């Protein structure tokens, strides 16, 4: 019997459909903000996740969070990214149309959130913002193991990366990723045959990737050693050729050259 599914539907697209269905079953966190980005209301999910963050990062009790700038509830390294999202405008100038969702990591607790903001309009015009987020931590990470001695818990280990493509959220398998390249507010994720944009920073990724497989060879590059092809020396610099569609030569910083050679078994 022939399948009724179009031949053009890829495995990745089928996985995206399955994940999208799961996402629809989630109870989202919802935060209402006024025109200045100050919190006016939470639903129960948002309070459960952001409440502890406010208590530990700001020393503010949950019942005192109302009226606080929502940016302050996130780690300092994530604040510029969130502020950029809240201030984003539609390229066509539409005051209602909202930017696409972003992935963001918060440290207290250690969670991965997909965040969407929508401008709200009342009879008198713009009146604030509705922020909706989905906690995709359990779909994208796993515990990294027990910390040694009484030390602080290690960040959870990533096994999938959430990205936004064609009006849907897709989870990329780490094993399919050749390299990551940092570029301003975004990180470009490169597979053998495609590229994706992610809002997760290289610093966030580096903490949550297996260091025996993924190495930050340069301030702007993390590579999967499984896709390394060749080390190329050019004058005083060293590049690593990666097995993506362009056979990209990734620069290797001097401080990482010896470590990279050791991991690759190169003398």
UniProtKB/Swiss-Prot annotation:
Keyword DNA-binding: yes
Annotated Gene3D superfamilies: LytTr DNA-binding domain, PAS domain
Residue ranges of domain HTH LytTR-type in the record: 161-266
PROSITE patterns the record matches: HTH_LYTTR, PAS
Effect after changing residue 74 to A: Loss of activity
Subcellular location: Cytoplasm
Function: One-component, b-type heme-containing aerobic sensor and transcriptional regulator that responds to CO by activating the expression of the oxidation operon cox.
Name of protein: Heme-containing CO-sensing transcriptional regulator RcoM 1
The organism's taxonomic lineage, starting at the top: Bacteria, Pseudomonadati, Pseudomonadota, Betaproteobacteria, Burkholderiales
């Amino acid at each position: 019997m022939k399948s009724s599914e179009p031949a053009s539907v890829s495995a990745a697209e089928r996985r995206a459909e399955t994940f999208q269905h799961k996402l629809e079953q989630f109870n989202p966190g919802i935060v209402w903000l006024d025109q200045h980005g100050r919190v006016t209301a939470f639903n129960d999910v948002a309070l459960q996740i952001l409440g502890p963050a406010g208590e530990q990062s700001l020393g503010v009790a949950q019942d005192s969070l109302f009226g606080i700038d929502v940016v302050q509830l996130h780690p300092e390294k994530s604040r510029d990214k969130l502020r950029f999202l809240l201030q984003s405008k539609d390229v066509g100038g539409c005051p209602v149309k909202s930017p696409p969702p972003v992935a963001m990591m918060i440290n207290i607790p250690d969670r991965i959130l997909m965040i969407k903001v929508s401008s709200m309009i009342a009879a008198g015009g713009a009146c604030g913002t509705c922020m909706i987020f989905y906690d995709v931590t359990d779909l994208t990470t796993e515990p990294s193991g027990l910390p040694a001695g009484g030390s602080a818990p290690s960040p959870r280990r990533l096994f999938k990366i959430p990205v936004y493509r064609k009006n849907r959220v897709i989870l990329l398998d780490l094993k399919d990723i050749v390299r990551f390249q940092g570029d301003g507010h975004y990180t470009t994720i490169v597979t053998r045959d495609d590229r994706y944009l992610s809002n997760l920073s290289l610093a966030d990724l580096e903490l949550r990737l297996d260091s025996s497989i993924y190495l930050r060879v340069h301030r702007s590059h993390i590579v999967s050693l499984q896709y390394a092809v060749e080390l190329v020396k050019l004058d005083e610099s060293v590049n690593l050729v990666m097995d993506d569609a362009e056979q990209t030569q990734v620069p290797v910083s001097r401080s990482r050259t010896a470590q990279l050679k050791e991991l690759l078994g190169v003398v």
